[in-house]
């Protein structure tokens, strides 16, 4: 299949390739009432993983506190090396790993190694062993069916609840059910997130979601680092010391234009889970291509504005479940719902052939209108912000309205009561007032007089002294007691009734939690694709095409997505590693000629295509890729206790042991960390190992300065090997780099030119060239002291010749001048 990039077509939109067995949630879009929007600082998310392995199958479930959701993975085959489990651990990075105390030996050894990994980033998980009885199949099933979930109506019968949960949880996957049961037991015992709550408050569970690893492309952390897919660096702000890090110059950094926090999280998730699922990838590309059309630019900008109002719905729902809702939560939820409705209305006018637009149109249901209408008609945002508590609008509850009217009329009424009280007081008391204090009631307030020093001086006949505050004496009188009996504690009564209404409103919202969860899922997906479309528009990316018929990748005029932003000009290069021809590409060339940039460019373009992004190339066709391995940079760490060369060997060993015929392997300067002969031998052995696999050889790009690899013909000749070089031109003493890849082999590394560019002294460079030439021609390398002695002899001979040429009979000869100008300067090089 030929390469092609067609940026102007609107293709039919296939649906997502990896369906999530979770609850839906819609989204809204319009401005909320006035007031200051407040978004709380999110607590650090915790992930607690429960895992069981038995008879070659793995059952996994984990709880994520960021969205109060339990994720599970159906029983999956995994051999004794537990590579699948390691992949899951690398992806979700749990705080704790819960498992049965009764385990197979392979699992026990794996957990022992996991617990001993001192260098694991950010930290090693806590291993928690529970009694095996807690993982019994029947007790786990009963634990799942008897759980109290906010998304299940209390009106459901036991049979209906079983049917509902059976549609979500695969009860035929025994290990998964046991893992879910053990996880629920752990959450109940540890009380994750509700440690300080009353014991009657359970751990909030807002949904179950299916966690899928199928069709994912394997990429290790070293590859993410060397390709600069992610790059964390210290934050320059002194106020960010706690969080400490920000995203540096990285692929994620330039593509992350998401407007909501959950969009950023989803983009990071896509980056950590590149996929081979063509239906899912094309579904993402269809949306990006649609928004790249010039006529759709205004629609994209409008949606971007709406997405900025989509906030942390799971956190709000969690607070509602715990009855910890804040005033700002209602305002944020109101804006979120109306923004989601705006997105739905916009998507209704877009092509329904695109799956995402169809999903938003269908799944942003009328429940959103119901939620928005309830909040808008009940919550008095202006008054709530003023009083910093939940208050309701007028005409919601006649009893509350009546009490508020009475409370508002109190000031004038209390003024009249105070005048009557003053008439009954001693004439020495100049003034008084009647005040209302919530929880205490009505009191008579009298200014403290000069003679009122001792407590006994505060006594006034007919009044009961209560307390002294700010030089005011507060008393109960017969009239204030009558007011207490007549009016009661109005403020607290109003507050209690409004809290009751808030609880009823919370129940209405929680009953529709699935639609809110789906809002977040689809809105974050739309946010990510709008961000990728924006980057593709600004940087001139094109749509990649996927072909299961080819192996490897074909790229026409590809560019490095980061380097092209840092360089004034960038020379594009093409790549063709499809089919059985040239599976091993050996790239030679001078230092600084662009070999490493080219390797990273191939890796990054392939990675971008596997996350469903447009790519920096004129055309790109991606075949079947199941993994990307790299040996480009040594990720050194003191805690590893390994030498730089040992780290290099470990990286190559990963590729040798795990790469298949569908893997992409990028190797840069392997073998440079040891003796050149040994390094060359190791590189040759690795390449010959892969070449011996024939058509099953991975797609390998090797950049090296070991020209002997080619000159000595250490690799077998055949169609599997292809030699490439970076084009250069010698212009006198200068070396001109064209940064263009071409067929052939470099004649020299031109290390001396690179050394001169780096500022090394000329004598050092000259000596280096002399040694290099001697080795290359097979001549012995002369030590430095012999060179010095030979130079001294040459200088002595030159001075003797000058003496022999003197004409001592010449009357014009001045020996003083001869000594000062010829002999003394030469003496410094002789003595």
From Swiss-Prot:
Signal peptide, first to last residue: none
Gene3D superfamilies reported in the protein's UniProt record: 1.10.1420.10, P-loop containing nucleotide triphosphate hydrolases (3.40.50.300)
GO molecular function, one term: double-stranded DNA binding
Binding site for ATP: 589-596
Taxonomy, superkingdom: Eukaryota
Pfam families: MutS_III, MutS_IV, MutS_V
Keyword entries, A-Z: ATP-binding, DNA damage, DNA repair, DNA-binding, Meiosis, Nucleotide-binding
GO cellular component, one term: nucleus
PROSITE patterns the record matches: DNA_MISMATCH_REPAIR_2
Any one GO biological process: mismatch repair
UniProt feature coiled coil, ranges: none
Region Disordered, residue ranges: 1-43
Family named by the database record: Belongs to the DNA mismatch repair MutS family.
Protein purpose: Involved in DNA mismatch repair and meiotic recombination processes. Facilitates crossovers between homologs during meiosis.
Subunit structure: Heterooligomer of MSH4 and MSH5. Interacts with HJURP. Interacts with C7h12orf40/REDIC1.
Protein name per its UniProtKB record: MutS protein homolog 5
Natural source organism: Rattus norvegicus (Rat)
